Amino acid sequence: MIVDAHAHVFRPAGVSPRGVDALAPAQRDAPVEDLLSVMAEHGVGAAVLVPLDHHDDYVRDVLRSHPRRFAAVAVADPAVQGRGHGDPVDRLKQRRDAFGFQALRTQWLGIPGRPIRESPFFPVLRVLADEGLCLWTYLVPDQLPLADELARELPSLTMVLNHLGFCPHDMRVDSHGRPAFDDPFPASTRAQLQRLSRRPNVYVMFSGQYALSRREPPYTDLDEVVHEIAGAFGASRMLWASDYPWTREVPGYRSLLDLPRATFPQASPAELADIQGGTALRLFPHLRPAEDR
């Protein structure tokens, strides 16, 4: 079964609360019904839904309506990261009681240069490890060094590096209404990814090429770094994702579905099956078809 391991669904801000910015202005709409239609058209059986921010309402409601079709990721707010008022573990539990998410996304782990165990976020990260929840990371550059320390301190924590593990910085919105970045893989990031690949519970998402490349699919200007990442992590720790809705029109869902085979023409059917769904199903086994559970 093909699984889209990272897709965003949301409604206009006046319909369901969410943040507003240049990428997702107030009237932009990405309802789950459209995603389901796109998935059906392309033979995709399940997806992992990621809200735009800490507003859980819409994805929570979608998950309640489609509990076997979707897994869900919550986005950590300052209170969950221990940078607000109150106990961050209590805040995590309050949100999870209302919204049964299976992973938590963050751009922040702790104070650069300080031990990860001293981070106010560490108690929450330990709860994730203890409860078998994934950490969905989209770390800014000064946070990536903390990820390896975290993987060492909490070896049972499953960490999924979003969008090939690159560190977002200086985002702009392109003419197609998509995020875009320059210089996504400096030598320091590539070295950190190699170190992280040695941690068996660290995974990487095969996605985001559209925002990182200066070419059209199959984004051959990224071949060197993508093959380097794939060689380090292996297909069994890679997850294909569309990053819907930013990619819905350009390059289009089909182009992204074809990308693993185009990028790895020597990959075996089993390796391609892992990238396009097998890995995600191991992380989110409730998405497996009933006959395979």
Please give the residue ranges for each predicted region.
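Mid-to-C-terminal alpha-helical segments outside catalytic/metal-binding sites
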Residues: 1-5, 23-46, 227-228, 232-239, ...
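Active-site neighborhood of phospho(di)ester-bond hydrolases with catalytic His/Asp-centered motifs
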Residues: 2-5, 49-50, 73-74, 105, ...
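Conserved, mostly hydrophobic/aromatic
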Residues: 6, 39, 59, 104, ...
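Active-site environment of divalent metal-dependent phosphoester hydrolases
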Residues: 10-13, 54-57, 79-81, 111-112, ...
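Divalent metal-dependent hydrolysis catalytic cores, especially in the metallo-beta-lactamase
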Residues: 22-54, 69-77, 102-109, 135, ...
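Active-site gating/metal-coordination segments in enzymes
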Residues: 56-143, 149, 183-184, 209
